[in-house]
Design a protein with these regions (language model features):
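Surface-exposed interaction/gating patches
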Residues: 94-97, 157-165, 169-172, 187
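Short, intrinsically disordered, charge-balanced linker/junction segments flanking boundaries
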Residues: 1-5, 11, 20, 205-207
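Catalytic cysteine-centered active-site loop
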Residues: 170-184, 188-207
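Short, conserved micro-motifs enriched in small and acidic residues
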Residues: 11, 84, 176-180
C-alpha cells in the first residue's frame, strides 16, 4: 500500500513483483512507481534489487502477470501440495521453463520458487523503462498499443479485462481483485493490456 506522507491516508496500491525506486533511507520512504506515481511505504516491504536487475528482467522478456483474481504458488505441481504464497491479479512473476500437470514453475522477486496454473498467467505487456529514464517527459504520451494489435482489438481486450472486476468491493486507493476504486479499475485494465496511464481520475500533463 502507498500512503500520503503522514502514513495514514491511502493513495495507491502496488503489487508483488512491481518495481519502485527511492532515494532516501528510513523506516518510511517515498517511492516512484514504474508508472510515474509517488507515495510513501514502509521500507521493510521492499525487496532491494539493482537497476541492472530491472534492466535484465526487461530484456529477458519472461515476466508474466497474474490474470486470475488470485493464484496460489505451490511447492509442487498439484493441488494437494503445500501453498507457499498467494498472488493477486496484477502481480508479476518470472516464468521458468519447467511445466507439469498444467502448472508452470515461477520465481518471485523475493527468490521463492513454486508452481502456479499456467492458465493464471499471461506475458507482461507494460514496461519498467520509465524508472531508468525519468527525464523522458514524453515517455507515457508516446506509448503505443502492443505490436500487432489494432485499435479495435485493444478496445475489446480492455473491456474484457474490466469485466473481470465485476463484483469487487470498493476500496479507496485499491487496485486488487479483493478491493478496488474507480480509477484503479481503469488503470489496471490498461496496464494489463500494455499501456500505462495516470493512476488518478484527473487530467495529468505528460500522460
Amino acid at each position: 500500500i502507498l500512503y500520503e506522507e503522514n502514513g495514514v491516508d491511502v493513495v495507491d496500491e502496488v503489487f508483488f513483483g512491481w518495481s519502485v525506486m527511492w532515494e532516501d533511507e528510513g523506516e518510511w520512504i517515498e517511492v516512484w512507481t514504474h508508472y510515474g506515481y509517488r507515495g510513501w511505504m514502509e521500507r521493510n516491504l521492499i525487496e532491494e534489487k539493482s537497476r541492472e536487475w530491472m534492466e535484465e528482467r526487461e530484456k529477458a522478456g519472461n515476466t508474466y502477470v497474474v490474470t486470475r483474481g488470485f493464484a496460489d504458488v505451490m511447492r509442487g505441481a498439484r493441488v494437494q501440495s503445500r501453498m507457499l504464497e498467494t498472488l493477486g491479479r496484477g502481480c508479476f512473476v518470472e516464468k521458468m521453463e519447467e511445466t507439469e500437470n498444467g502448472y508452470c514453475r515461477v520465481k518471485l522477486a523475493n527468490g521463492i520458487s513454486g508452481f502456479v496454473p499456467e492458465v493464471a498467467l499471461r506475458k507482461r505487456l507494460d514496461s519498467d523503462r520509465f524508472l531508468w529514464g525519468k527525464s523522458e517527459e514524453r515517455f507515457f504520451v508516446e506509448q503505443g498499443i502492443p505490436e500487432g494489435w489494432s485499435e479495435e482489438k485493444f478496445r475489446r481486450k480492455v473491456v474484457e479485462c474490466a469485466k473481470g472486476y465485476l463484483g469487487c468491493q470498493y476500496r479507496w486507493g485499491g487496485k486488487a481483485a479483493d478491493g478496488i476504486d474507480c480509477s484503479g479499475v481503469v488503470f489496471m485494465v490498461y496496464l494489463m493490456n500494455g499501456v500505462l496511464i495516470w493512476r488518478d481520475a484527473d487530467i495529468r500533463e505528460g500522460y
